[in-house]
């Protein structure tokens, strides 16, 4: 399959691994204090474990996991607010499949469905808009979440809802922005992050220039990388070369997909519908300044929270779970005392075990047998 098989070719992978090992000998880092590369995106984390790339690294390079999985950082209180709305008479509540099993204090949306709420899985926000048009006597709510990657689709759907005059369609906003989170991580004095592999999907929208502050203000090298083995390994080589040269630059490994300027049409749609401002709570990380997303005045009438006014929910994370430490690269999933026991894919305690892109789910799927051994 073109653009897939050639990026997974075993011979080329091993050649690149050997090149990485040779270059890593020039690093000042050791096995006791390796070069810590944070892969920000959950898709990167999944690919790293699926293909065993972390096991091919030289001993003085380590991948650490970041907060780039939007389902994984869903606060419990937001899930409870969704359940409140979904449980009301006459409501059809729509969201993506990953969000169905995220636990809140009052259970999950899947459990709310089992109790009688009309909760439905959709594959795009346009599916929810079609439901609203097909059911004019019902109030249809779309629970939209994700980083800049998914915001354009939501924005264009709301534009369509406005143009068509769909009065029974509402939007529960859990979109968040990635860059303030990276800044928040780097502002923590004990962050231990030496370099970044930045997500290709978000970068398709925002471009590469948006990451400039990481290199200029925090002096960390960053490479935007794709999701195949050769992409990730080449990204690691590029970060090693910058570290050897004592450079801190933003580079683009994923040029076949990501233009440096991003997607101007997607950026325009986001700017019309959303205000990228305000604080937002992230599960396991607390409140992060300037990471929130809100509807602009022209689209306020679609605001589900303003219409339904669910009771404010603020639920503290269970201190036994180490979700926040996993999301900031401070520990590995299997080092959490709940991993694989209280928290597993069949009965998830934390959101990182729910999403297919969650670090804990990836560890459980690809590393559990090694841990048991």
Language-model region placement:
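Metallocofactor- and cofactor-centric catalytic cores in central/energy metabolism, strongly enriched
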Residues: 1-137, 151, 155, 159-164, ...
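Hydrophobic alpha-helical scaffolding
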Residues: 6, 72, 143, 147, ...
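A conserved active-site cap/scaffold subdomain adjacent to cofactor or substrate pockets
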Residues: 172, 190-259
